[in-house]
Amino acid sequence: MAMRFLNIGYGNIVSAHRIIAIVSPESAPIKRTVQEAREHNALLDATYGRKTRAVIVMDDGHVVLSPIQPETIAHRLNNKEELSEEG
């Protein structure tokens, strides 16, 4: 199985097969999840100082902040041409 990567904005990529959820950052439970990840040094901020539009939860407990809308990231995940392949 080839490892696939997903562009989450500004040249940042994550491993596509390790994503559990892509959610909006607006709800209180997601805000709590982001704060807990920050406190446990498991937060990766890929926004380059811009507004967080999507929160990506990874299978290893890391939480990734992205400046791209969740719908756009999901579309990229479902669109095979948008994924980069290793090797």
UniProtKB/Swiss-Prot annotation:
Coiled-coil-forming residues are none
Give the PANTHER family listed for this entry: REGULATORY PROTEIN SSL2874-RELATED, REGULATORY PROTEIN TM_1690-RELATED
Q: Record's family?
A: Belongs to the RemA family.
Q: What is this protein called?
A: Putative regulatory protein BCAH187_A3920
Superkingdom classification of source: Bacteria
Supply the source organism for this entry: Bacillus cereus (strain AH187)
